Regions:
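Bacterial N-terminal signal peptides that target proteins for export
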Residues: 2-16
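Prokaryotic Sec-type signal peptides and long signal-anchor helices
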Residues: 6-9, 26, 78
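Bacterial N-terminal signal peptides
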Residues: 14-25
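Pepsin/retropepsin-fold aspartyl endopeptidases
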Residues: 28-292
Length: 292
């Protein structure tokens, strides 16, 4: 599950744009949708329908979530979901803690030109954990994997399908399924940090790139106070070690990234390594095709 704590300016602009698009005949989803950066995160507008209620919402793109997620306050107050519509379930937090949540089924979700019916979502107390930084809706893999999606981070557009032109680099990934079924199609990429081999988990809902502290030398580390949290524990400021401008190779793509150092064995990347690129996320082929 993603880590969420950032400034809310991007979501505000997304909602303004979405409201205008629907006022002009609901054509926001005909070909593509705008993307709005917010720190390391990317948001895009969606439309949710539950019964006779139709809601506009800015959704966080999160490759680290198998299911879509609805904030519990938003689910009750805006979607008008009540106890009878919610089923108790369990999921895993980023620290592997088992967390009690609820599930619901939304009648309809319009996302990037495609209508999805009967969308199963997790209902999580995001606002209680991440406070003012919590999104109302998270776009998980169930929607992201339905068709190839082209992310134009230069022009801030999200569209369905392939972009013309040969890819400059094709990144191939592997998947892993959890034993409890809460995590189904996770994206794992081979790479290197410095000169050491790693396997990256791609979590676009994570604020920081993270790597095990034993993979990088002690020289050049900084101490920083950063907000951290997940669905098992509320947001709080922690002192962490950070390494900046680290040479990083993701499959055949080389870049430089900042990393938060952790004691976890799993390395994590957000979309920062793809900044200023145009790429296609294709779950069927298990590829990220970075365009020229």
């Amino acid at each position: 599950m993603c880590s969420i704590f950032s400034i809310s300016r991007g979501r505000g602009w997304a909602l303004v744009c979405l409201a205008l698009c629907f006022a002009m005949g609901g054509k926001a989803f005909s070909q593509s949708s705008p993307l709005f950066p917010e720190g390391a995160y990317w948001y895009t507008p969606l439309r949710l329908s539950q019964g006779e209620r139709k809601l506009t919402v800015s959704g966080l793109i999160d490759t680290g979530c198998s299911f879509c997620v609805v904030d519990s306050t938003f689910a009750v107050d805006s979607c008008r979901l009540r106890g009878a519509a919610l089923t108790t379930s369990y999921t895993r937090a980023a620290n592997e803690d088992r967390v009690k949540v609820h599930t619901c089924v939304l009648d309809r979700v319009d996302f990037c030109g495609t209508t999805f019916l009967d969308v199963k979502c997790l209902v999580v107390d995001l606002k209680g954990k991440f406070f003012a930084y919590a999104p109302n809706f998270i776009v998980g893999e169930k929607l992201l994997s339905a068709q190839p999606l082209c992310f134009d981070l230069r022009n801030r557009r999200l569209s369905v399908g392939e972009r013309e032109g040969e890819p400059a680099v094709v990144l191939h990934w592997q998947t892993r399924e959890s034993r409890d079924g809460t995590f189904t199609k996770g994206i794992y990429l081979k790479g290197r940090v410095g000169n050491k081999k790693v396997r990256f988990f791609l979590d676009s809902g994570g604020r920081y790139n993270k790597v095990n502290l034993n993979l990088l030398p002690a020289e050049g580390r900084e101490q920083m106070d950063l907000p951290r949290g997940d669905i098992s524990q509320a947001l709080r400021v922690q002192q962490v070690q950070v390494c900046r401008n680290v040479e990083t190779k993701v499959d055949d793509w080389t870049t430089r990234l900042n990393f938060v150092l952790t004691d976890q064995s799993e390395a994590v990347l957000n979309f920062d390594f793809l900044r200023n690129t145009v790429f296609v996320l294709d779950y069927d082929r298990r590829e990220i095709r970075i365009k020229r």
